[in-house]
């Protein structure tokens, strides 16, 4: 054990020798130094303090703030197994104070650390009883920041320089800290100008203005004009304008901006803020503006947000116009908004043949974003009439006797096939019911369409796939009576094969259990077939075959399980 410890110590010394004035290397050393005994720590810390004197202030403060954070972390999680003793932490604190920066402003930068890991030297430990530990530490953070800023002002240090360094070091809440603690929630033109000058990206400026604007004590229009006079940052300008809660479209800040700003504004993936007191015409104006300047996603997001503020007819009209938007940017939430809008429109217009057809066309347009079960109007159209389904067949499959492949048709078929394969429905089904007359009419028309397309050989295979999605019959067995009659009338080997395959595929993912579940399915399908065999022999034959398939599969799974043992 002694030899192993000696190796660790020598390795640490080797790392220290190679660290020189590299802050990153010293930070890595600090992460493991607590594992060594006191004399070794003292030796390493003394070397660290010496090397820090040779560093520039930027490097010094990185090391110093790392030590500060380790003190905070260990005192906060005081009961954790990996925690340092208070004796070691006091040593850390002592050594931290020995690291002196030439420009004292650097010592104030830690006040811009995030709320959730603000490096208090003496936080309330997480082990304390009570649920308000976070709130109490937040209060301590506020006191710390206020005290440090008071000291900063008393010593006459430059606020402009503090802002410059904080932005340079990429602290993320600079604007918020200045607004809340330095300006006490009030607008300070000098601070704003300094933030604009030092932060080219504009995030700190936005955070500063946003915090004060939320308190309602800033003239946003005046600030926007001031930013325009100082900066050419259009992104910052757009973000600031986005803070406005609009209640009057004529006087809205965005209304008077140029085309570029409007495009950036309406393409932002943030919810438009319209006052609850705004008149109906404000929402109508916003729809037009978003349609003209926004993206596919932001337009959908906006329609979703105001769906309760406009009539269903207006929502319907606005949704139909989405196909005119050229900016087709989408994100992970686009399908959520789309589904929410369609849920409303489908509920109101699914019985209106004209509007249902238009919505079905739009559902087809969005087929890459909507799941089949969400395309209720398209389902109704295809269940009521086979024309569209047949047209898809003509795109995907070759004509009888045709070997030539048209390249344009092949590319179109590739785009359509995956969706076509998801279209699972029973023709003419409505609310779980199917009538023989309607189903036969659909089947006959579909066969005639296939014949006219020179694809009649596909009839049995396609019909078998669709009929497998029949609802349950009045007697509690599958398929329903109307489908049984159609199977008896149009039965072919291809219909049987496709029906069996589709029915088995409906099972989906399942747990392997040595054939037990397959045996249960075998019995269930056998019982179903026995009930049908006298009156519907062809239909029963289909279910007997499914039963036999599961019986074979059950034996196979049982054998596999036994072989594993």
Say what each PLM segment does.
Residues 1-504:
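Non-catalytic all-alpha helical scaffold/repeat segments
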Residues 494-507, 512-513, 562-565:
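Non-globular sequence segments
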Residues 514-526:
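Short amphipathic alpha-helical heptad-repeat segments
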Residues 526-532:
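Short, charged/polar, low-complexity loop and linker segments
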Residues 528, 545-546, 553:
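The canonical alpha-helical register within tetratricopeptide repeats
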Residues 539-549:
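Short, charged, amphipathic alpha-helical segments
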Residues 550-564:
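Amphipathic alpha-helical coiled-coil segments
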């Amino acid at each position: 054990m002694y030899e192993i410890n000696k190796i660790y110590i020598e390795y640490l010394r080797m790392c220290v020798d190679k660290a020189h004035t590299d802050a990153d290397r010293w930070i890595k050393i600090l992460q493991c130094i607590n594992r060594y005994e006191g004399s070794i720590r003292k030796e390493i810390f003394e070397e660290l303090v010496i090397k820090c004197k040779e560093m520039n202030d930027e490097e010094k403060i990185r090391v110093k703030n790392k030590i500060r954070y380790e003190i905070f972390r260990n005192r906060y999680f005081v009961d954790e197994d990996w925690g340092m003793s208070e004796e070691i932490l006091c040593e850390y604190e002592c050594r931290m104070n020995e690291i002196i920066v030439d420009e004292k402003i650097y010592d104030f930068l830690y006040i811009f650390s995030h709320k959730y890991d603000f490096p208090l030297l003496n936080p309330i430990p997480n082990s304390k009883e009570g649920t308000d530990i976070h709130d109490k530490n937040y209060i301590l953070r506020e006191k710390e920041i206020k005290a440090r800023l008071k000291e900063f002002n008393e010593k006459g240090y430059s606020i402009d320089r503090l802002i410059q360094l904080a932005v340079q070091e990429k602290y993320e809440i600079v604007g918020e800290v200045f607004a809340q603690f330095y300006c006490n929630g009030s607008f300070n033109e000098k601070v704003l100008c300094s933030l604009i000058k030092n932060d080219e990206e504009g995030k700190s400026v936005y955070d500063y203005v946003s915090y004060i604007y939320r308190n309602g004590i800033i003239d946003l229009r005046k600030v926007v004009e001031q930013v325009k006079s100082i900066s050419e940052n259009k992104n910052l300008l757009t973000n600031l304008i986005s803070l406005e809660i609009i209640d009057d479209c004529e006087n809205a800040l965005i209304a008077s901006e140029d085309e570029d700003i409007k495009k950036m504004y309406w393409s932002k993936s943030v919810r438009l803020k319209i006052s609850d007191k705004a008149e109906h015409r404000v929402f109508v104006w916003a729809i037009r503006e978003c349609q003209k300047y926004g993206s596919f996603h932001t337009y959908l997001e906006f329609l979703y947000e105001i769906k309760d503020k406009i009539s269903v007819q207006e929502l319907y009209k606005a949704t139909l116009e989405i196909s005119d938007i050229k900016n087709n940017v989408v994100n992970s939430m686009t399908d959520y908004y789309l589904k929410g809008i369609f849920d409303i429109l489908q509920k109101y217009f699914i019985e209106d043949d004209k509007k249902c057809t238009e919505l079905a066309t739009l559902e087809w347009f969005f087929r890459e974003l909507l799941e089949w079960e969400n395309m209720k109007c398209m389902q109704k159209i295809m269940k009521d009439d086979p024309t569209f389904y047949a047209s898809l067949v003509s795109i995907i499959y070759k004509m009888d006797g045709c070997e030539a492949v048209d390249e344009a048709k092949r590319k179109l078929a590739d785009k359509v096939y995956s969706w076509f394969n998801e279209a699972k429905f029973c023709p003419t089904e409505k609310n779980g019911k199917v009538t023989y007359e309607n189903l036969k009419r659909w089947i006959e028309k579909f066969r005639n369409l296939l014949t006219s397309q020179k694809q009649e050989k596909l009839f049995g295979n396609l019909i078998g796939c669709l009929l497998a999605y029949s609802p349950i019959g009045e007697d509690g067995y599958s398929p329903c009576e109307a489908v049984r009659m159609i199977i008896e009338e149009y039965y072919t080997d291809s219909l049987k094969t496709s029906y069996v395959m589709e029915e088995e595929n409906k099972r989906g993912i399942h747990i392997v259990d040595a054939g037990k579940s397959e045996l249960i399915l075998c019995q269930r399908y056998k019982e179903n077939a026995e009930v049908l065999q006298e009156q519907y022999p062809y239909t029963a034959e289909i279910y007997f075959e499914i039963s036999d398939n599961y019986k074979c599969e059950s034996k196979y799974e049982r054998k596999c399980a036994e072989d594993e043992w």
